Structure formats: structure tokens, C-alpha cells
Amino acid sequence: MTEQAQNPSSSEKRAVILLSGGLDSATVVAMARAEGYRCYTMSFDYGQRHRAELHAAERVARDLGVVEHKVIGLNLNGIGGSALTDSTIEVPEAPGEGIPVTYVPARNTVFLSLALGWAEVLHARDIFIGVNAVDYSGYPDCRPEFVEAFERMANLATKAGVEGQGFRIQAPLQNLSKAEIIQAGVRLGVDYGLTVSCYQADDSGHACGKCDSCRLRAEGFKAAGISDPTPYF
């Protein structure tokens, strides 16, 4: 019998954690581990501009000692509609008004749905996601209302939820600034040199230093008073 098919003991806590390979999700893995969870991480090869973040996710998962790291293949560039999945749309190098073109339609809904499925198989009741509503790019699926609504849906749409074994969607970074996230991660031993945040990093993980994600990351390290380990072009 595989570990996935076994019910955990009453004292064992399991969590599925969405791990992009970036700063925020790496911090969330460390937080869950510190809370005593056996951590199962999930990343997605969804047709994004580069694979550097997937390599980063593997490094982070290994460094933080997760139980299992799973990479799911999707083809969101078949849908397009985002600068991250459509090479004909340029990644902006300055903040704009409204929801930016780097928003990927329904991405967190899709990712959380697959994490929910794995959590049900694992008999895990907690799903962690590194969304943030303070220092963020304005994506609608990073807001607290979205997280709360998805949790309600998860408990309506699953066998476990119907049988009273409810799921919790945990977003521990929701109300933290980027500086606070970095400070928390450093306290928990996160090696941010392993992570990649840039929307258009090269294959080696070197960052452009110009996109919104790079800007938020650099400002966060500066505000935290911590040296930024990010390699740039």
C-alpha cells in the first residue's frame, strides 16, 4: 500500500502546498513545516515563459525536506490571455493601472483544484497557498475573498467535505508585507538564493530586475534590511 492510500495517524498532520519556486511559496513551505505538518508540494508546468521556477521549486522542496514533490503538466498557453503564457504579449516593465497582463486567467482556481484532489487522496485536510494582498500585483485570485470562497467550494464538492472531514485553505502570507514575509522566512531558515521570482528569468534563473515581480522582491529585501541574493542578467 502506498503512503497516499494510508490514513494518517490521529497525531499526524499532512498538508499540500502550492510551490511555484518563488519567494512567497518557499516561505509558506517553511511555515507549514514549522507548524508540524508533513509537507507535500505541488508545482505546475503550465506553459509559462521559463522553466527556471520549476527548477527552483525542486531545489526548495529538497532543501526544506518535503515528503513528496509533484510537478503537474498543464497547457494553459493553449488558452493564452496572459503575458506569462502568450509570447506575443510583452511583460510590462512599469506598474500600470488595473489588473496587469501578467494575470493568468483562473490560474489559482485551477491550481487549488488539483491540490484539493491530491489532498483528498492523501487524507490531508490543509492546503497552503502563498497568495498575498499587501505587496502584490492586484490579481483577483490573490484576495482573501477568493480564498474563503474556494474553501467553501472545497467542502461542498468533495467526498471528504460531505462526510464532515473539512478542508482548510491556509494563506498565511495574506496580510504580510513583502519585507515581513522575507523576515519570517529568514527566521525559519529559507534560502532565498534557491528561489526565482522573475516573470522572464533566463534558464539559469537570472532575473531581469525590471518586471513587477522583480520590483516587489527587490523592494521587500531592501525594506527588510536583508541582502538580496537574486542574480540578475
UniProtKB/Swiss-Prot annotation:
Catalytic activity line of the entry: 7-carboxy-7-deazaguanine + NH4(+) + ATP = 7-cyano-7-deazaguanine + ADP + phosphate + H2O + H(+)
Sequence similarity: Belongs to the QueC family.
Superkingdom per UniProt: Bacteria
NCBIfam families assigned: 7-cyano-7-deazaguanine synthase QueC (TIGR00364)
Cofactor binding note of this UniProt entry: Binds 1 zinc ion per subunit.
Binding annotation for Zn(2+): C198, C208, C211, C214
Listed EC numbers: 6.3.4.20
Cofactor(s) listed in the protein's UniProt record: Zn(2+)
Species of the source: Pseudomonas fluorescens (strain ATCC BAA-477 / NRRL B-23932 / Pf-5)
Name the UniProt record assigns to this protein: 7-cyano-7-deazaguanine synthase 1
Record's function text: Catalyzes the ATP-dependent conversion of 7-carboxy-7-deazaguanine (CDG) to 7-cyano-7-deazaguanine (preQ(0)).
Pathway(s) per entry: Purine metabolism; 7-cyano-7-deazaguanine biosynthesis
